[in-house]
Design a protein with these regions (language model features):
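C-terminal, flexible cofactor-proximal segment of oxidoreductases
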Residues: 442, 460-550
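N-terminal Rossmann-like FAD-binding beta1-loop-alpha1 element of flavoenzymes
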Residues: 110-142, 310-326
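Glycine-rich active-site loop/strand segments that organize a redox cofactor
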Residues: 139, 146-203, 335-362, 366-369
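FAD-binding core/adjacent interface of flavoenzyme oxidoreductases
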Residues: 110-111, 136, 207-305, 414-425, ...
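Glycine-rich dinucleotide-binding loop and its adjacent helix/turn
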Residues: 197-200, 271-328, 334, 458-473
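FAD-site-proximal beta/loop scaffold in flavoenzymes
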Residues: 289-303, 423, 430-432, 437-497
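A Rossmann-like FAD-binding core segment of flavoenzymes
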Residues: 224, 241-245, 260, 264, ...
Length: 550
C-alpha cells in the first residue's frame, strides 16, 4: 500500500493559514480606522455639547452634528463590535431626528426629477449627492449608462492607472481621498491601492452605487435629449448589449410590442458621460490621422504586437504609452509639439503629474528607453508602399525652441534621450505599426446626443479649456435651461476640472440648483457640503499653487 502524501495537505493548510492571517490583518486595520473615526467624531461633538450646556448662547444647529454622526456610523460599519461608536451614536439620535428634512411633493408632472447620463465617477457621485445629501427621492433620480457602471474605466488599457494618488486620510485630517466621489468613502481603503487600475476603480463605483441604493439602468444608450417648451425633457433611449438582444427578440416575437426605442420624461438632465469613449475623430487632427490607432483602443500594452512604435502626443496619454512600451522593452519614438516634461505650472491640470514624471524617469533608464522629440508637430501620416514595402511614414516639422520656466529647485529629467531640431526643418519617421495617436479626446458633449444643446467657446482658452462648453455659475448650459454638465469637461475662468478631486467639488453646486428648483430647502445641505470641501463656488483659491515655498 502506497503511503498517502501529506505535502498537498500541508500546502493547503499553509494557504488557509495565510488567508486567515490576511483576513485578520484586514479586520485589524478596520478596527484601527474605526477607533480613529470615533476619536475624531468625539472631538467634533465636544464643543457642540458645551454650546448646548451654555445657556447664554443659542444651541448649535442639528446639522452641525451630522459630520460626527457620519463618522460614528462609518466606525460601526468598519467594526460592528465597537460599543463606543454605538454609544456615541445613540447620544446623537435625538438631535439628528429633529434634523430629518421633509421632502416636498413633486412640483411638476414628469415621472422623474433627474436623469443622469453616465454611470461613471461623475454620475455615481452626483447620484449620491442628490439623494443622500440633498434628499431627493432615489426612485425619481435615474442614472443611465450604455455600458456597465464604470464602463470607461473598464475600457482602460490593463496597465493604465490613476495618476492622482489615493490615500485614506479622512479620519485624521480635514481632507479626504483625492479619488473619492463621495465623502466618507475612499478608493484607497476599498481597493488597497494608491494608484488604482480602471477595473479596480469600476469596482469601487459599483459598490458605492449599491451601498447608496442608487437607481441605475445599465446597457441603456441615450440617443436624443429633447427640451420641452414648458420645461423638462424627453430623453430617447435604446437598449445595448444583452438588453438590445432581448428587446429585439421580444419585438420579433410580438409585433404588437413597443418599439425598441423608448422615451423618458424628466424635469432635469445631468450630462455626465465623460470623455474616454469619445476620442478625437479620425480626420480632425491632421491628414492621415485615420491611419493611426488611438491609445484608448489598446486593451493591454503587454499583448500589443509589433515593435518600433511612433507615439504622437506628449501629454498624459502619450507618456503612459511610452512608459508601458519601454517596460515591455519595445522601441518607441514620441513626437510632441510641446516638451511637457519641461512644463511647470501652478495648475496640476496643465502639467504632467508627479506620478507620470517618475514613470518617465524610469522609462528613460530602461534597457530600451524611448526617444522624446519636441517641439515637433506632425502634419501628415501616410502609408509607405515603397522603400520599406509597408508600414507608415510620419511627417513632422520642428518648432521654435522654447525656454520653459521652472522653479529654482525643480529636479528635471535627463536630456540624454531628448532630441530637438532646427526650426522649420521637416523630418520623416518610419514605423511598421500604425502610429499611436495620443492627442486626447473630443468628449461626449461635443460628439454626443447633446452637442446641439450647448454653446461652445469658439477656441477661447488653452489646452482642455479650448472649445469648452459654455456654462453658467451652476454648471448649467447657457443655451438649454435645465441641462447640467458634470465631470472633466467643466471649466470656468480658464480653469479646468479634469481631476476627480476637482470636478467632485462642483457636484453640490449642481445638486443645490436642481434641489431648489424642485422646491427643497437646501441651506443645511449646502453648509454640510462646504464643511466637507465639496462646494466650490469661489475660484480665487484655485489660481495659484504653493510653489517651492508656501
Amino acid at each position: 500500500m502506497t503511503p498517502r502524501s501529506t505535502s498537498g495537505k500541508r500546502k493547503t493548510d499553509d494557504a488557509s493559514e495565510d488567508l486567515e492571517r490576511e483576513i485578520e490583518a484586514h479586520a485589524e486595520r478596520g478596527r484601527g480606522l474605526a477607533r480613529a473615526l470615533v476619536e475624531k467624531g468625539k472631538s467634533l461633538v465636544a464643543p457642540l455639547l458645551e454650546q448646548v450646556r451654555d445657556e447664554s448662547v443659542d444651541d448649535p444647529a442639528p446639522s452641525m452634528f451630522r459630520e460626527a454622526a457620519d463618522m460614528f456610523e462609518a466606525a460601526i460599519g468598519l467594526d460592528p463590535e465597537n460599543t463606543e461608536a454605538e454609544g456615541e451614536m445613540e447620544k446623537l439620535l435625538d438631535v439628528l431626528e429633529e434634523e430629518e428634512p421633509t421632502r416636498p411633493p413633486p412640483n411638476h408632472d414628469d415621472p422623474l426629477d433627474v436623469v443622469i447620463v453616465g454611470a461613471g465617477a461623475s454620475g455615481i457621485g452626483l447620484g449620491i449627492m442628490l439623494t443622500r445629501t440633498f434628499n431627493l427621492d432615489p426612485e425619481r433620480v435615474l442614472i443611465v449608462d450604455r455600458g456597465e457602471v464604470g464602463e470607461s474605466f473598464l475600457r482602460w488599457p490593463r496597465e493604465m492607472r490613476f495618476i492622482s494618488p489615493s490615500f485614506n486620510s479622512q479620519g485624521w485630517t480635514g481632507s479626504f481621498d483625492l479619488n473619492s466621489v463621495a465623502f466618507g468613502t475612499s478608493p484607497a481603503y476599498t481597493l488597497h491601492s494608491e494608484h488604482a487600475t480602471g477595473e479596480q476603480y469600476a469596482y469601487y463605483l459599483r459598490e458605492l452605487a449599491k451601498a447608496g441604493e442608487l437607481n441605475v439602468k445599465t446597457h441603456t444608450e441615450v440617443t436624443a435629449v429633447r427640451p420641452r417648451r414648458r420645461g423638462g425633457f424627453i430623453i430617447d433611449v435604446v437598449p445595448t448589449g444583452n438588453n438590445a438582444a432581448n428587446a429585439q427578440d421580444q419585438h420579433a416575437q410580438d409585433q404588437a410590442s413597443q418599439p425598441v426605442k423608448t422615451s423618458l420624461r424628466s424635469r432635469y438632465v445631468i450630462w455626465a458621460a465623460g470623455e474616454f469613449q469619445y476620442p478625437h475623430g479620425s480626420t480632425s487632427v491632421f491628414p492621415g490621422s485615420e491611419l493611426c490607432r488611438h491609445n484608448s483602443t489598446v486593451e493591454s500594452w503587454k499583448t500589443l504586437s509589433g515593435n518600433d512604435f511612433v507615439v504622437i502626443g506628449g501629454y498624459e496619454s502619450g507618456m503612459d504609452a511610452v512608459s508601458n512600451l519601454a517596460a515591455c522593452t519595445k522601441r518607441c519614438t514620441l513626437v510632441s509639439s510641446t516638451a511637457y516634461w519641461r512644463v511647470s505650472t501652478d495648475d496640476p491640470s496643465t502639467e504632467l503629474a508627479p506620478h507620470t514624471m517618475v514613470r518617465i524617469d524610469e522609462a528613460l533608464r530602461a534597457s530600451v528607453p524611448p526617444r522624446l522629440l519636441a517641439p515637433l508637430r506632425v502634419f501628415k501620416v501616410e502609408r509607405d508602399n515603397t522603400k520599406h514595402k509597408g508600414g507608415y511614414v510620419v511627417r513632422a516639422r520642428w518648432g521654435a525652441p522654447v525656454d520653459y520656466k521652472s522653479g529654482e529647485y525643480t529636479v528635471l529629467i535627463s536630456d540624454e534621450n531628448v532630441e530637438t531640431g532646427e526650426e522649420g526643418a521637416e523630418i520623416e519617421l518610419y514605423t511598421p505599426q500604425p502610429p499611436l495617436l495620443c492627442t486626447g479626446f473630443e468628449g461626449s458633449v461635443a460628439s454626443g446626443a447633446v452637442k446641439e444643446l450647448f454653446e461652445f467657446s469658439d477656441g477661447d482658452g488653452e489646452g482642455c479649456a479650448a472649445d469648452a462648453p459654455l456654462l453658467n455659475e451652476y454648471d448649467e448650459s447657457t443655451k438649454t435651461p435645465g441641462l447640467f454638465l458634470a465631470g472633466p469637461a467643466v471649466s470656468h475662468d480658464g480653469l479646468v476640472f479634469c481631476f476627480v478631486y476637482k470636478f467632485r467639488q462642483r457636484f453640490a453646486v449642481v445638486a443645490d440648483a436642481i434641489a431648489r428648483g424642485l422646491g427643497h430647502k437646501t441651506a443645511a445641505a449646502v453648509d454640510k457640503c462646504r464643511e466637507m470641501n465639496m462646494f466650490l463656488d469661489d475660484f480665487s483659491c484655485c489660481k495659484g499653487a504653493c510653489g517651492e515655498a508656501c
